[in-house]
Amino acid sequence: MSERIDFDVNDEDLRREFLCDVLPRAIASLESHTQSRWGGMSAQQMVEHLTWAFDLSTGTRQVECPYAEDKRARLKAFLYDNRPSPQDFMNPALVGGLPPLEHPALPEARAALLASVRRFLDPPDEGTDVRHMHPIFGPLDRDEWSRTHFKHGFHHLSQFGLVARRDDERAP
């Protein structure tokens, strides 16, 4: 059964609650045999994909952004509108397919994700101007990464039936 949550990317407290409470609770309930409702990811692939994104946001991993600055600015507007990511969205960084799994099983992948989330939530004092590269939006600051993680996390947790918008009548 999906946990029904409010969806408001512009509510900083709600985003923090999602990252601190909803995401860890949902990931804890995920089983390796849980099937996605759309897309081709397994449960472990989804968890490792989220870890990758959190690692980008802390500078633990790096990626290039192929888009010119003017296109990045247009794409970045998505971080501020209150629409969820579409189900059929294809990340250009994954056009060649999903990377190989890094962990032997879901429990290890889950632990790695939770550690990455903690690194994002409790960063070392690195100043307020620090930006890390996103593969679509370009360099993002902490607020923009928080918006990204909220939308991205909601998208993938919805993909596996772990969360749904409180106001979505169609959700189970």
Predicted regions and their residues:
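Extreme N-terminal tail/first-helix region
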Residues: 1-25
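Short, helix-capping/interhelical loops that line the mouth of catalytic, cofactor-
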Residues: 2-8, 59-113, 120-123
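Conserved functional micro-motifs across diverse proteins
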Residues: 18, 22-29, 45, 49
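Hydrophobic packing residues in well-ordered alpha-helices of helical domains and bundles
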Residues: 20-23, 106, 110-113, 146-149
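Short helix-to-loop capping/linker segments positioned immediately adjacent to catalytic or ligand/cofactor-binding
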Residues: 30-38, 100-103
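Short, contiguous alpha-helical
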Residues: 33-85, 122, 132-172
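N-terminus-centered regions that define maturation/targeting leaders and the start
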Residues: 50, 113-116
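Short helix/strand-capping connector loops at secondary-structure junctions
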Residues: 90-98, 128-141
